[in-house]
């Protein structure tokens, strides 16, 4: 008894990680102990939240505090400790053995391990605590991948726990755990174990090592069989609006690329154990290039690292897989990385891809821009139109023009070359003439519609009989043409809404003109129905259609820059300032009208005698014969106050004159003085604010008109009017001729000179000794036309590409000061080059 008491006194202050509960000496060691004393301070239970319908707090990937304490964990025994097992809900009692029992020669029981003890050891990077783990697993025939050694809620293993608890970038237990897993024949399963909860589902140790930017651990894991194609597709790794998380493309390669770790990217692609597939896609079909576009945010630093990483991966992929066209792979939405950058408004990445020019001979086929010639600051560049022009599905022009109004940088992206010059080329060559012709036809249609409406019959009920007169024949012809135009606009509007399917917000922002044309056609069709229904109300619907028809004339101002910008300002002021003004004004009008109507009482003073002729009445004593005790009449009178034409004594049929005057004065102050002046101030501010924005919006509207006109052509006509020209710009990696549909843009750049530019033609404006004509203009920006008739470019491009293939030096023009003497062969070169100029 004294011995037990002494032991109890020694264990009165147990360590923080152990619970000691001494029993009395006369108690059976196997009996159930009394319940443990509860903690004085109640701990808040932490709930793991993974689903979208759960609380806003998301569970962390790792936490130093394990849930459930020791209640749900098996017992832990140490060789120098005798463990008394209790029930699952009770604590575990630990008692030290006496020196006599140790000296008796009784065999010391092996140490037992559970999830808690292993997790604590790896979190502290304590390898000594895991020395007996291998023997324990071998004797118990267990593995580290068994469910009892995993977190029951997240599926986290001790390896994942160790990866999340690095000390100075390393954890000594990781190599030990991998060695134990190898000796228990569970290495591959252990190293590829991932989270199983919905929030971090699929994340493996390799993902964590890459996220921790630890090259040594990445190498160690890949050497031990880590799956380089493991996909982390939990909710945290998805691009969900309004939820925290980080989308990187799910795959380890994409994670390394999106976190700017080029060394790990190269290792994953070039290691000898398990190279990553550079063309692998995630659950939404995005490749590593798509993922880079997704993480771009248009800031300077982010755009710089994304474009550099994009370029490195593209070149590395070309060297590893020469025939793979990585940039042409599409996701499940059918978008290439270029189209994805356009649809998401990543203007920095978009400009880089469109203007990418690689000078390395073995990777020059990756370029989308080829410098034809350069002279001083002037560069003549050939832009590859693949995935840009409307001849291909999901082209960049269509994606930008028809994208949602919420797309950032939507207007500015059309100013990036070659998009800006390409649209201008289409407008100058054929769209401009078609647009002006449509404008003329619409003006003629409105004149016919107006004439037919003005000379309509006024006697009798419709439909009216046709008299055998020239005037009636012209009138009926005009009516038929007017109705035909209404039917055309109706079906064109239906086609537009079915193809574009705009949202409610973009419907009033981007589809402003289409809505007006559609409403005009609806009024026309309603007028036709009322006309044949013997109702004279057809006139009301017809005049509304007529008024909207002339208003829609503003649509054709987009063909003229100054008028187009002015029309955009009117549209923006209507949608922004005027709509807000009308909402507040209608609230005031309705509120004060109901108050005035309630105050007015019908009486003889409120109307004129019947015998008084209205047209002879003058002054405030003359009032119309209707009663003002109606909301309609009162609203009309109050509206007159808004425009400064109201009369404070428009009626005298009230009992509280002071209240009546106060209501009218308050209405005048709030509407005529406050709201109208505020509207004028807001309109002036809007004009100043959107001056430059209006120009870009006008360019976007004109771009939509250009694409709509081009889409109305037959397929054969589209090819005939296609901008650019098919040219050979070099050779493909498999040795075939590399033909591209190119568009030439002449640029002036005062920062980039022709010292380090891969130039196709040595002589500016002179190809194979044939000079260009003086009709060449830097403003043309076109490949087709007379600029291409004066020289043969394809043979020269083929020769330039051949020189690149047989030469180890890249083609660069080096301007150096020459101090030596000329050799004979140099003289021959100069003589040949000067010969054309001397002729």
From Swiss-Prot:
ANK repeat ranges per the UniProt record: 111-139, 154-186, 204-229, 250-277, 286-322, 336-359, 394-416
Residue(s) carrying Phosphoserine: 117, 503, 775, 801, 821
Alphabetically ordered keywords of this record: ANK repeat, ATP-binding, Calcium, Calcium channel, Calcium transport, Calmodulin-binding, Cell membrane, Cell projection, Glycoprotein, Ion channel, Ion transport, Membrane, Metal-binding, Nucleotide-binding, Phosphoprotein, Postsynaptic cell membrane, Repeat, Sodium, Synapse, Transmembrane, Transmembrane helix, Transport
Modified positions (Phosphothreonine) in chain numbering: 145, 371, 705
UniProt motif (Selectivity filter) ranges: 644-647
Reactions accelerated catalytically: Ca(2+)(in) = Ca(2+)(out); Mg(2+)(in) = Mg(2+)(out); Na(+)(in) = Na(+)(out); K(+)(in) = K(+)(out)
Binding site for resiniferatoxin: 512-513, 551, 558
UniProt protein name: Transient receptor potential cation channel subfamily V member 1
High-level lineage: Eukaryota, Metazoa, Chordata, Craniata, Vertebrata
């Amino acid at each position: 008894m004294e011995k037990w008491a002494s032991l109890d006194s020694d264990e009165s202050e147990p360590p923080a990680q152990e619970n000691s509960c001494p029993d009395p000496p006369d108690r059976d060691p196997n009996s159930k102990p009394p319940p443990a004393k509860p903690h004085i301070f109640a701990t808040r239970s932490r709930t793991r939240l993974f689903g979208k319908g759960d609380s806003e707090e998301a569970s962390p990937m790792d936490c130093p505090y394990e849930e459930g304490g020791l209640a749900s964990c098996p017992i832990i025994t140490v060789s120098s400790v005798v463990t008394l097992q209790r029930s699952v809900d009770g604590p575990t009692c630990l008692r030290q053995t006496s020196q006599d029992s140790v000296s008796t020669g009784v065999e010391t029981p092996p140490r037992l391990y559970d999830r808690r003890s292993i997790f604590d050891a790896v979190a502290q990077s304590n390898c000594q605590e895991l020395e007996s783990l291998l023997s324990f697993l071998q004797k118990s025939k267990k593995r580290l991948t068994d469910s009892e050694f995993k977190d029951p809620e997240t599926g986290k293993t001790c390896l994942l726990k160790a990866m999340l608890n690095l000390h100075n970038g390393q954890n000594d237990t990781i190599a030990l755990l991998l060695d134990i897993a190898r000796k228990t024949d569970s290495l591959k399963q252990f190293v590829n174990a991932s989270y199983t909860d919905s929030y971090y589902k699929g994340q493996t140790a390799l993902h964590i090592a890459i996220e921790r930017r630890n090259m040594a651990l990445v190498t160690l894991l890949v050497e031990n069989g880590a799956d380089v194609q493991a996909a982390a597709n939990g909710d945290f790794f998805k691009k969900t609006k309004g939820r925290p998380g980080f989308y990187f493309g799910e795959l380890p390669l994409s994670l390394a690329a999106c976190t700017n770790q080029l060394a790990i990217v190269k290792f994953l692609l070039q290691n000898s154990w398990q190279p990553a597939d550079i063309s692998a896609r995630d659950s939404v079909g995005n490749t590593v290039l798509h993922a880079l576009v997704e993480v771009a945010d248009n800031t300077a630093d982010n755009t710089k690292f994304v474009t550099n990483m994009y370029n490195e991966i593209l070149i590395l992929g070309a060297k590893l897989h020469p025939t793979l066209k990585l940039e042409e792979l599409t996701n499940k939405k059918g978008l290439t990385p270029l189209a994805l950058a356009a649809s998401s408004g990543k203007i920095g990445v978009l400009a880089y891809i469109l203007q990418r020019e690689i000078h390395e001979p073995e990777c020059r086929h990756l370029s989308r821009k080829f410098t034809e010639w350069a002279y001083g600051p002037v560069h003549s560049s050939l832009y590859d139109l693949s995935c840009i022009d409307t001849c291909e599905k999901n082209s960049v022009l269509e994606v930008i023009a028809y994208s949602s109004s919420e797309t950032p940088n939507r207007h500015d992206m059309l100013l990036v070359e070659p998009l800006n010059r390409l649209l201008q080329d289409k407008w100058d060559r054929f769209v401009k003439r078609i647009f002006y012709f449509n404008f003329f036809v619409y003006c003629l249609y409105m004149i016919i519609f107006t004439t037919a409406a003005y000379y309509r019959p006024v006697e009798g009920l419709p439909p009216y009989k046709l008299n055998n007169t020239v005037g009636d024949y012209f009138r009926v012809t005009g009516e038929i043409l007017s109705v035909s135009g209404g039917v055309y606009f109706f079906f064109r509007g239906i086609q537009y809404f079915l193809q574009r399917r705009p949202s409610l917000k973009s419907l009033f922002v981007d589809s402003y003109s289409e809505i007006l044309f559609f409403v005009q056609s609806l009024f026309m069709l309603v007028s036709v129905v009322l006309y044949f229904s013997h109702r004279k109300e057809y006139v009301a619907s017809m005049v509304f259609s007529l008024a909207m028809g002339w208003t829609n004339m503003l649509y054709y101002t987009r063909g003229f820059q100054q008028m187009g910008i002015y029309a955009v300002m009117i549209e923006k002021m209507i949608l922004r300032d005027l709509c807000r003004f009308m909402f507040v004004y209608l609230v005031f009008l309705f509120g004060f009208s109901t108050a005035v109507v309630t105050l007015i009482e019908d009486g003889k003073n409120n109307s004129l005698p019947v015998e008084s002729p209205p047209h002879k009445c003058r002054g405030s004593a003359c009032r119309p014969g209707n009663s003002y005790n109606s909301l309609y009449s009162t609203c009309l009178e109050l509206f007159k106050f808004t425009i400064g034409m109201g009369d404070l004594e428009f009626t005298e049929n009230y009992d509280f004159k002071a209240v009546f005057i106060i209501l009218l004065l308050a209405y005048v102050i709030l509407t005529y003085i406050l709201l109208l002046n505020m509207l004028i101030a807001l309109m002036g501010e809007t004009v100043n604010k959107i001056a430059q924005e209006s120009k870009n919006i006008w360019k976007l509207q004109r771009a939509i008109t250009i694409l709509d006109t081009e889409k109305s052509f037959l397929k054969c006509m589209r090819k005939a009017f296609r901008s650019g020209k098919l040219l050979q710009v070099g050779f493909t990696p498999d040795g075939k001729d590399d033909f591209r549909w190119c568009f030439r843009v002449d640029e002036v750049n005062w920062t980039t000179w022709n010292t380090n530019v891969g130039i196709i033609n040595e002589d500016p404006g002179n190809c194979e000794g044939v000079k260009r004509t003086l009709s060449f203009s830097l403003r043309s920006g076109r490949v087709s036309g007379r600029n291409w008739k004066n020289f043969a470019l394809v043979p020269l491009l083929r020769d330039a590409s051949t020189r690149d293939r047989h030469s180890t030096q890249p083609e660069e023009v080096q301007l150096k000061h020459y101090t030596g003497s000329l050799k004979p062969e140099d003289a021959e070169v100069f003589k040949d080059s000067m010969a054309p100029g001397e002729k």
